[in-house]
């Protein structure tokens, strides 16, 4: 008897995403699982069991990227014991998929049973946060409501309504893994271990879900958090907010939230390392008279003494007026003041007076 199309068994299109396949599988399991049909007649139970096995087989293939590609290319023949005895059939085949299948099933990197049975930390999340240039130099505290995932306190992370609603998975006998034989063109029969298609690696079946988390084992809450941005932080750096990532597995801790700092550009200031640069227009009169001028900085005005030998474009250092090092606040950069000379406006009479003065000056720069 010819096997039915796996996509039709699950009631999904051939282009269905993995999320759609998982959703369809869970809906069908909820209908045809043996534990859901105990009150029906013997014949109906037998039909439900046969249907359930079809659903398992279809899900086992379509939920695995490698097997799904093989099925889409070769159909049921990819898993037939008589297929692949020869050395042909490599055209268009992805060897990367083959070897990823090997490494996932042959224990490279550790036991798969251990992987699914031990507590694992949740996935780390990443987000961006935008601050001004001045805030990056001075530091800032931000209060924000963040999503947090905690273990359900009603079921203690089991997902079941009570302990009596948890049974050992009949398909994998509690191991979380199942063994299968693949017939890969050019390789012959290959034994492989995959995640159990019934319990999805947990080793247990739940007959009644927890009323609070509905079997998800975790609950989602909102928590007000104060995020401290250290003084001197630079664009592209990260701040870690512990415990605000994805939910842990098997009672493991939640992952972390990594905030990428994005510093907006400033109209006047730029930064290089811990040094801050600023262009400062100064009157040539202040330079000639060697006056002291006030220069803006992120922490306020700084006084700079001008000297008559300065030239336009000269860089004047104001020590420790730059940015603090976020890892060591005792290290502080300098303020680099780029002098830009300008000539003030003069009245015609003032120009005449200046010309008389200039006529008496021996301009040595003309010889250069």
Swiss-Prot record:
Zn(2+) 1 binds at residues 152, 155, 210, 213. Its cofactor is Zn(2+). Zn(2+) 2 binds at residues 169, 172, 196, 199. It is found in: Cytoplasm. Keywords: Chaperone, Cytoplasm, DNA replication, Metal-binding, Repeat, Stress response, Zinc, Zinc-finger. A zinc finger (CR-type) spans 139-222. GO terms for biological process: chaperone cofactor-dependent protein refolding; DNA replication; protein refolding; response to heat. CXXCXGXG motif repeats lie at residues 152-159, 169-176, 196-203, 210-217. Residues 5-75 form the J domain. GO terms for molecular function: ATP binding; heat shock protein binding; unfolded protein binding; zinc ion binding. InterPro entries: DnaJ, DnaJ_C, DnaJ_domain, DnaJ_domain_CS, HSP40/DnaJ_pept-bd, HSP_DnaJ_Cys-rich_dom, HSP_DnaJ_Cys-rich_dom_sf, J_dom_sf. Binds 2 Zn(2+) ions per monomer. GO terms for cellular component: cytoplasm. Participates actively in the response to hyperosmotic and heat shock by preventing the aggregation of stress-denatured proteins and by disaggregating proteins, also in an autonomous, DnaK-independent fashion. Unfolded proteins bind initially to DnaJ; upon interaction with the DnaJ-bound protein, DnaK hydrolyzes its bound ATP, resulting in the formation of a stable complex. GrpE releases ADP from DnaK; ATP binding to DnaK triggers the release of the substrate protein, thus completing the reaction cycle. Belongs to the DnaJ family. The J domain is necessary and sufficient to stimulate DnaK ATPase activity. Zinc center 1 plays an important role in the autonomous, DnaK-independent chaperone activity of DnaJ. Zinc center 2 is essential for interaction with DnaK and for DnaJ activity. Homodimer. This is Chaperone protein DnaJ. It comes from Mesomycoplasma hyopneumoniae (strain 232).
């Amino acid at each position: 008897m010819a096997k039915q199309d796996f996509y039709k068994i699950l009631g999904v299109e051939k282009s269905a995403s993995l999320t759609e396949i998982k959703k369809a599988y869970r809906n069908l399991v909820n209908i045809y699982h043996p534990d859901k049909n105990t009150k029906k007649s013997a014949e109906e139970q037998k039909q439900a069991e046969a249907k359930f096995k079809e659903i398992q087989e279809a899900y086992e293939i379509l939920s695995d990227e490698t097997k799904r590609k093989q099925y889409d290319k070769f159909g049921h023949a990819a898993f037939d014991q008589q297929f692949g005895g020869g050395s042909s059939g490599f055209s268009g085949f992805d060897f990367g998929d083959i070897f990823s299948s090997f490494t996932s099933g042959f224990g490279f990197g550790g036991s798969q049973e251990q992987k699914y049975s031990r507590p694992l930390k949740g996935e780390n999340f990443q987000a961006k946060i935008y601050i001004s240039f001045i805030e990056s130099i001075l530091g800032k505290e931000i209060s924000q409501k963040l999503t947090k995932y905690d273990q359900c306190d009603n079921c203690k992370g089991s997902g079941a309504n009570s302990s009596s609603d948890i049974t050992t998975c009949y398909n994998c006998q509690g191991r979380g893994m199942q063994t299968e034989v693949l017939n890969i063109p050019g390789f012959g029969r290959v034994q492989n271990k995959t995640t159990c298609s019934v319990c999805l690696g947990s080793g247990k079946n739940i007959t009644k879900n927890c009323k609070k988390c509905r079997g998800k084992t975790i609950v989602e809450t909102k928590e007000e958090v104060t995020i401290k941005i250290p003084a001197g932080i630079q664009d592209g750096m990260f701040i870690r907010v512990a415990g605000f990532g994805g939910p842990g597995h098997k009672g493991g801790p939640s992952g972390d939230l990594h905030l990428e700092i994005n510093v907006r550009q400033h109209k006047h200031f730029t930064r290089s390392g811990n040094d801050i640069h600023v262009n400062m227009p100064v009157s040539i009169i202040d330079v000639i008279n060697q006056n002291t001028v006030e220069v803006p900085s992120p922490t306020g005005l700084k006084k700079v003494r001008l000297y008559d030998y300065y030239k336009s474009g000269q860089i004047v250092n104001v020590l420790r007026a730059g940015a603090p090092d976020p890892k060591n606040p005792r290290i502080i950069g300098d303020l680099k003041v780029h002098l830009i000379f300008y000539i003030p406006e003069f009245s015609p009479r003032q120009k005449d007076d200046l010309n008389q003065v200039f006529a008496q000056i021996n301009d040595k720069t003309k010889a250069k």
